[in-house]
Amino acid sequence: MVLRNLTAMAIYDQTFVYSSDDALAGMVVSMECLTGLFLLVAVIIGCFRIAALKSPFGILMINQNCAQLMACINSGSFSTLGVLLNIKPVLSISYLFGNFSIFLLPVILISFLLMSFNRFCACFFPLRYQNLFSSSMIRTFIVFNWLLSLVAGSYLVVVRECNFVFYHFGWLFAGSVSVKCGTLLSLYSISIQTVLSITIVGLDVVTLVALMAFRSKVYQSHSVEVRRRELSFSGQVIIQGAVFLCHGAWYDMGHAILPGNDDRWKFFFTTSFSSNLLHVFDPVVVFAFNKEFRRWLFRNFNVPTAQKRIVTVVSAHNT
């Protein structure tokens, strides 16, 4: 696990002079967030338009992607205005952007956990599924998710006076140097991501193995199309959970793997760059694993025929 010397980084920031490297780092993250913005919006619209996703799983997907869209806009706004354009008033309130991202982190992860739990229950408790994921229960799950994250974030920011601030050295957000907060903020973000990611992947693996091993019993009364869709949904959430788990490991240990001696860029690629790349990767996984999304995308956005053939061939190969 890499130890980032926040005190030294704060001292460096006191003599900070804007350079082309700052503009480059800001532009890279801005482009990531802009790409993620369009993809996440497409997923959200698709969830409302596609008949197969007008379901409990689709509602949970909308909740997760809305939370991730908010994180994407938050990060993209700061990177464009503060890092790329070096607007001082924006930089001076970096803690507002950072604290908001800390609040959204558990919302996004718990949303993924709810999606995994949904697939788990659909597989192992089909007779109770409608009760477990009725409209009222889904609303309860979602409200509880946001309230729990709000309470945890409020405790960190208000009670323990923790702030997630921007450092020019490495172009990253990290906890501010505070006696009352200490390392609590770092431990919170790392532990919640690790615990929830492992739980998500564990649920997904159990569900996917059960679907593959007992598909004839689980879906004996369902059509081939329904079986394929359920496997696709399960594959989607297991990949997304695994990516979050790998990202947590990369965040902590990627610094030792990267070549070169410039710690600024090593910090950048293991934190800000990789974190915001998730805004792009997650919706791409959705499109890759869901035939309904691809059909809807091709039909509504006039994707060239050549690209259709390529995706069809890849999809057939994966099948």
Curated annotation (Swiss-Prot):
Its main location: membrane. The keyword Membrane applies. PANTHER family: 7TM GPCR SERPENTINE RECEPTOR CLASS X (SRX) DOMAIN-CONTAINING PROTEIN-RELATED (PTHR23017:SF24), SERPENTINE RECEPTOR, CLASS X (PTHR23017). Belongs to the G-protein coupled receptor 1 family. This is Serpentine receptor class X-43. GO terms for molecular function: pheromone receptor activity. Gene3D superfamilies: Rhodopsin 7-helix transmembrane proteins. Expressed in ASI sensory neurons. SUPFAM superfamilies: Family A G protein-coupled receptor-like (SSF81321). One of its GO terms (cellular component) is plasma membrane. Receptor for the ascaroside pheromone icas#9 which suppresses exploratory forgaging behavior. In response to ascaroside icas#9, may furthermore play a role in the expression of genes in the TGF-beta signaling pathway, such as daf-7, and in insulin signaling pathway, such as daf-28, which may in turn contribute to exploratory behavior. The chain crosses the membrane at residues 28-48, 67-87, 95-115, 138-158, 164-184, 194-214, 267-287. It comes from the Eukaryota. It is a multi-pass membrane protein. GO terms for biological process: calcium-mediated signaling; cellular response to pheromone; locomotory exploration behavior.
